[in-house]
């Protein structure tokens, strides 16, 4: 087994997990990208864990299906179209991961039937025809096991996107086999570069896959969503006790919302909360699903008041709803507002008449951005995807359709429900109400 293989295993699985535990978690991750029989473009997830890869792939697949295709019946997805969609999606994610790595791309595959001595492992062998490598799901996981599988994988490198796209398409059967999800994950990690990932992760000793529960880390989710394996979901970088904590640096194509924000464990920044396309990964405590819509008006450019709210909140990392008055000048400069000292003092007195030394978000927005509501439609059709059969209505992996209504602060609330999915979506739309076409609300778990 090569040093690169060992580094990869430590990055993903950690160094101290027992072999038995590794095999248990490993088996939960050994599945391919398999489409649902009930919904042509929906990927199925067999056990808990691999949603950290499957959900982002599903989200980017939907982006391509909904916004790069002219077809009207988007839910009608024949096999040849699925093949093309999946391969293009995998390439897009690999391209995003490779942006910091001088345009070099990697694919990891496994060599069935080879001995450890015969296998180059991750020695970086040059690109070769796929006929030299067998991609079959016939060999059971139990026959391989954790150690054996990692002794039978190899890396191939590509210098151009065109070569990569041809290889990904050529190896379509590999992505659907029993190891497809892991092989794609390893391809992303090696395309990004192990050292690059370690430089972005807050604690490089923490594995990307939890060795006890098998869940993917936030760094892994962020890597697949943005191409950067940072550990946080806020906008930009922050300093804490002299330590630099990396966040998200630009608007993501696909967004991220989490129930953890509704529970006040974290605060997702605008770059993930307001993505380029109306598709969001939705996180519960243990699982990832996808919430999406076809209405691009949902991701219209920020209104000035929304930009002001975002900038104000970067100076309020604790989400208190206020900042010290000493920071008012910084906020106003960041928003290109008048910021000469006399005017700043005038505004401090107006916004803090009691002299408490704080500036509240509400009065600040009302002063500089009055009568500016949130942009976007008030009512829109939405869909929810959950890859686990047992979590779906009638145990069929299908998109659940619904109608979302976004109300103003002063509107009487319809109060349709108080479900986890609604609480999660309220972190993006505080006054959202949801009406689903099924008898029960979609599950986040």
Swiss-Prot record:
Active site: 51, 287
Catalytic reaction equation(s): Thiol-dependent hydrolysis of ester, thioester, amide, peptide and isopeptide bonds formed by the C-terminal Gly of ubiquitin (a 76-residue protein attached to proteins as an intracellular targeting signal)
EC number(s) given by UniProt: 3.4.19.12
Gene3D superfamilies assigned: EF-hand
Keywords for the protein's UniProt record, in alphabetical order: Apoptosis, Hydrolase, Nucleus, Phosphoprotein, Protease, Thiol protease, Ubl conjugation pathway
Modified residues (Phosphoserine): 125
Subcellular localization(s) per the UniProt record: Nucleus
Gene Ontology BP terms: apoptotic process; protein K48-linked deubiquitination; proteolysis
Gene Ontology MF annotations: cysteine-type deubiquitinase activity; K48-linked deubiquitinase activity
Signal peptide location: none
Domain of life: Eukaryota
InterPro entries hit by this protein: EF-hand-dom_pair (IPR011992), MINDY-3/4_CD (IPR025257), MINY3/4 (IPR039785)
Keyword Protease (UniProt): yes
Family: Belongs to the MINDY deubiquitinase family. FAM188 subfamily.
Role, per record: Hydrolase that can remove 'Lys-48'-linked conjugated ubiquitin from proteins.
Subunit record text: Interacts with COPS5.
Protein name as it appears in the record: Ubiquitin carboxyl-terminal hydrolase MINDY-3
